[in-house]
Amino acid sequence: MVYIIMGVSGCGKTTVGEVLAERLGVAFYDADGYHPDANRRKMAAGTPLNDMDRRPWLENLAEHIVQWNAEGDAVLACSALKQSYRNIMGRRGGVRYIYLQGSRDVIAQRLDDRTGHFFPADLLDSQFADLEPPTNAVVVAVDQPINAQVEQIVGAIGVGHA
């Protein structure tokens, strides 16, 4: 199973994903690392990605998900904002979504505090506009400590209990 930690930029996908992967003893991957250079340049310039920009990235992730499932469980941090994106990534099964949900104000503050990341805070509005909250995900509020979020996820997915 690949557990996909999803949500808008700044919600804590990477941090929660890394802690969850360590807790489960599985590999962690960050979908940001699979963006083509053209997408990175576009985001760094403050231009939102469109569905055509995202399609090759999502197809690449879908292939990696098949590979990761063959190797065992894994955790992937990925925005997965739209249902159509989730459909591409999960079309061959073996995925479970964990949605990190937070208010725009909380997320904006996190982005303002962040350094060394290529996602400008002013793209947040476009992410919230694109966001189609999932109906088939574990929903975790981001306004609680990281360890509490991970404990909630572990309880919901039923693996990794000490």
Task: Label each PLM-derived region with a short phrase.
Residues 2:
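Walker A (P-loop) ATP-phosphate-binding motif of ABC ATPase nucleotide-binding domains
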Residues 5:
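Hydrophobic anchor at the beta1->P-loop junction of P-loop NTPases
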Residues 8:
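P-loop (Walker A) phosphate-binding loop of NTP-binding proteins
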Residues 13:
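Conserved lysine of the Walker
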Residues 18, 22-60:
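Conserved substrate/cofactor phosphate-moiety recognition/catalytic segment
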Residues 71-74, 96:
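Loop/turn-to-beta-strand initiation segments
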Residues 90-110:
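Conserved phosphate-donor/acceptor-positioning beta-strand/loop module used by diverse small-molecule
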Residues 113-154:
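Small-molecule kinase domains that catalyze NTP-dependent phosphoryl transfer to phosphate-bearing small molecules
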